[in-house]
């Protein structure tokens, strides 16, 4: 699983956790956010997951059931590409989400348990030249999220804006992180 090696009792802000989740797929931060929000809703971690499922239904999702907060394989957890596009389009309406999802990088500051800063980098190759590879940068890409599990393979949500139009693209079950390198974008 992906993580940023945070320690029990370490103090991070919600914003710092969201950057860690979106840029580094930090599962420990995803769980911390879910537990915190679930408690704010008067419950616990499961309360957060139940709220995710309720919100998905409100958005019109018909082929989605969340059973965890990080998307790791679970036989009672699934989402279709169409439903992920609905969820992503709704998330994109939020200014904070757009800022985080479109950030090439972010540095977590020192904390009460970690005496060094932690650099986070967006793994979305249209946003950040990950590992020095700038061949996939796309100037109209405004954000996105990569993902990978052995069950789901490579997944990608991308946002792009051009000529006043915002596009949401969802790719699931890709064999490699760069499956479509033979295509060019205008």
Predicted feature residues:
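Domain-terminus/edge residues, biased toward the C-terminal soluble/receptor-binding domains
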Residues: 61-62, 73-78, 82-183
């Amino acid at each position: 699983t992906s993580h940023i090696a945070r320690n029990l009792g370490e103090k991070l802000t919600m914003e710092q956790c969201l950057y860690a989740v979106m840029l580094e797929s930090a599962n420990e931060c995803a769980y911390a956010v879910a537990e915190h929000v679930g408690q704010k809703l008067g419950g616990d971690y499961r309360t957060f997951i139940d709220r995710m499922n309720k919100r998905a239904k409100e958005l019109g999702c018909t082929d989605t059931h969340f059973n965890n907060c990080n998307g790791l394989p679970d036989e009672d957890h699934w989402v279709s590409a169409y439903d992920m596009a609905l969820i992503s389009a709704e998330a994109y309406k939020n200014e904070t989400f757009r800022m985080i999802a479109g950030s090439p990088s972010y540095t977590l500051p020192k904390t009460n348990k970690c005496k060094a800063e932690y650099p986070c980098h967006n793994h979305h190759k249209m946003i950040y030249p990950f590992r020095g590879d700038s061949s996939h940068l796309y100037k109209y890409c405004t954000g996105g999220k990569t993902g990978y599990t052995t069950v789901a393979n490579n997944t990608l949500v991308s946002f792009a804006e051009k000529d006043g139009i915002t596009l949401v693209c969802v790719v699931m079950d890709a064999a490699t992180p760069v499956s479509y390198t033979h295509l060019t974008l205008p």
